[in-house]
Amino acid sequence: MSRNNEELQGISLLGNQKTQYPTGYAPEILEAFDNKHPDNDYFVKFVCPEFTSLCPMTGQPDFATIYIRYIPHIKMVESKSLKLYLFSFRNHGDFHEDCVNIIMKDLIALMDPKYIEVFGEFTPRGGIAIHPFANYGKAGTEFETLARKRLFEHDAQ
């Protein structure tokens, strides 16, 4: 069952050959589309191996693989807009932990998922690797319980 034009309203970046790459943090670039299967609970996983941001103290680049897993509700994130959004961190100065939490909060604001987790596997600097993990489960649902459980067990992956 293909999507019709009405279902694709608001998706402007996918297939656009005149892509504009943001030069600064750009949450407004994120686009969403309707989940055709809101009655099914299923995971969507993105692996983003080319994430870069800047150290807020030194201005040096930080590199990471960002893992995003979510259980959609009504809306889902469009992947090209996600790619451009993550690219917008390239000149953004923030700590690793901040980047992961900002990404999660922006995706919650966009999609209102049942559950989401964002994990950053940052390349070691100064001999230390930082791997922040943030998650969220919709309040008052079984996903709130899942989020709490995953928070304490995420390193057992």
From Swiss-Prot:
Chain ranges passing through the membrane: none
Top-rank taxon: Bacteria
The enzyme's E.C. designation: 1.7.1.13
GO molecular function: preQ1 synthase activity
Example GO biological process: queuosine biosynthetic process
Active site: 55, 62
EC class of the enzyme, as a word: oxidoreductase
Pathway info: tRNA modification; tRNA-queuosine biosynthesis
One GO location term (cellular component): cytosol
Function statement: Catalyzes the NADPH-dependent reduction of 7-cyano-7-deazaguanine (preQ0) to 7-aminomethyl-7-deazaguanine (preQ1).
Family, as annotated: Belongs to the GTP cyclohydrolase I family. QueF type 1 subfamily.
Name recorded for this polypeptide: NADPH-dependent 7-cyano-7-deazaguanine reductase
Record gene name: queF
